[in-house]
Amino acid sequence: MPLRDKYCQTDHHHHGCCEPVYILEPGDPPLLQQPVQTSKSGIQQIIECFRSGTKQLKHILLKDVDTIFECKLCRSLFRGLPNLITHKKFYCPPSLQMDDNLPDVNDKQSQAISDLLEAIYPRVDKREYIIKLEPIETNQNAVFQYISRTDNPAEVTESSSTPEQTEVQIQETSSEQLKAVPDADTEVEEAIEPPSIETVVDEAAAPTEEQPQESQADLETSDSSDLGHQLICCLCRKEFNSRRGVRRHIRKVHKKKMEELKKYIETRKTPNQSSKGRSKSVLVSLSRSCPVCCKSFATKANVRRHFDEVHRGLRRDSITPDIATKPGQPLFLDSASPKKSFKTRKQKSSKAEYNLTACKCLLCKRKYSSQIMLKRHMQIVHKITLSGANSKREKGPNNTANSSEVKVELADSVESSPPSITHSPQNELKGTNHSNEKKNTPATQKNKVKQDSESPKSASPSAAGGQQKTRKPKLSAGFDFKQLYCKLCKRQFTSKQNLTKHIELHTDGNNIYVKFYKCPLCTYETRRKRDVIRHITVVHKKSSRYLGKITASLEIRAIKKPIDFVLNKVAKRGPSREEAKHNDSKQDGTSNSPSKKYEVADVGIEVKVTKNFSLHRCNKCGKAFAKKTYLEHHKKTHKANATNSPEGNKTKGRSTRSKALV
């Protein structure tokens, strides 16, 4: 069977390629038929396709075709041009030796290559430009230059009188077109000698020096040219109709950074485009910009928002008054003497800073949709932390001094005279707690009256302490500010700030609560969500798919119970345990040693949850366990804690589980 011949299709040597084949190979018909002759071959054929071919043919040649180079001497094929050059250099040198120093312009190959490049990458037609010069009445050393094309005289471009800048303007006329047409009477088409470079530099420096002085003025400018304003590039004095165009021009042509764009933009009022109008034009700098980073904005409200969010540490006084406040609202700046600085600080603290009921910040006159957003704004922008206990307290003119001390009352006033409940044992009665708190309230009220008497607009001491009477016993009943201890969760904190954040979890307006999570299948409730999930898994034997449905509804089914429920439960357990110990010790006739009392009273109670499942509950703390061994292990923790003093246990931070009754 004869082999397929691999000769080039363009050469017709008939070495058996046209002879009949014994085994026909099905395939693409153009691969099987003879090559079709065209008027041109080789690279000339490609050039002709790019010249007169369709768009689809050009796309095929550029995108969908790879080139294979063939040496005409040895008929070797090369996929890459470097390999072909190396091959021609060492193995098949070209027949014609050409001199590189004297290239023949009329050479057909050079002409073919230039035609190919012109066909693939057509250049813009070479246009001739006319430079028209217009004199300036006020300055004899400078002229206005206008560049226009010969084919389109209506398109005119204004430029400065420097030749180097004229070349830049010629490059930009194809992309950016301006509509500034000078009067035909004042045009001078004869050649005028350009002024010296020093005068041009002085002209360019003059507007930049005037710009910082004019930046102090608050002049409203418009983005559109309909209002008679036109944007000018300070570097080349080119006019634009939009800010986007002048920014792109400065960034692309003059290679300036984004932060420096504002420095090179000016606005000019152009009532008419005559020479007198240009000479008497008013240069106005854009006023809606940030004074710190010089970033320009569309409105003054955007400047205020940018200043509050980006430059948080700075005050609004650094902005000009017309930007710092809304229209019609004056900006109050601190211009007091050093002697009165202490008084002004007190007066400033006594002023109303926010209104939680209206969700409004009184410092920057902003309203928010919720109190959470207002708290976040006060903390981020004004560095004022609002605690949850005073979330619904309104700031009226009569109680401004009292309201400014709300944050201090939670920690500092309690620190001066801590309630005795912090030093009482854990199983102390609730009645003793309230009696001790009532003893300590007069001392705290005295400290508060002293603070209120210092401010000039303070309310009466009785009115100031009236609201605190209802507030402080609740906070002190659940939290120890001196020890930084939460009695509800039995957790100790490292700082007052962490304790204050934790108090917000227990507060809902003026009420303090403890959240309990309930089991949807039984009466089991606990303070930890994961305990409910474990309870549903262990006790009710539910799958993870069921847990996925229930977990989302646990937060909705949660119950907010007052702290009296938790504190009373601890108080009620104390005497009941003592009575149980006392009765058991009498029946057994044993001694009154604490360890033996503990062992006698420490009997687990079996509680049936379902028909086939029961829990073993500890009668000390009310915890329930699935196995009796777990209950025995739990009893050992009570024995270890019984040896320690109750005060030591209270100061030490503990992480305990929920104490819910089944």
UniProtKB/Swiss-Prot annotation:
One Pfam family per UniProt: zf-C2H2
Domain of life the protein comes from: Eukaryota
Compartments where located: Nucleus
Cellular component aspect of the GO annotation: nucleus
Described purpose of this protein according to its UniProt entry: May be involved in transcriptional regulation.
Region entry Disordered, spans: 172-197, 205-224, 319-349, 389-473, 573-597, 633-662
Family designation: Belongs to the krueppel C2H2-type zinc-finger protein family.
PROSITE patterns membership: ZINC_FINGER_C2H2_1, ZINC_FINGER_C2H2_2
Biased composition (Low complexity): 205-216, 456-468
Biological process annotations from GO: acinar cell differentiation; endocrine pancreas development
Zinc finger residue ranges, C2H2-type: 69-91, 231-254, 288-311, 357-382, 484-506, 517-540, 616-638
Bias type Polar residues, positions: 414-434
Protein name as annotated: Zinc finger protein 800
Gene encoding the protein: Znf800
Metal-binding as UniProt keyword: yes
Phosphoserine: modified positions: S318, S337, S420, S424, S453, S455, S458, S460
Organism: Mus musculus (Mouse)
Cross-link entry Glycyl lysine isopeptide (Lys-Gly) (interchain with G-Cter in SUMO2), positions: K132, K280, K392, K474, K597
Keyword presence, Glycoprotein: no
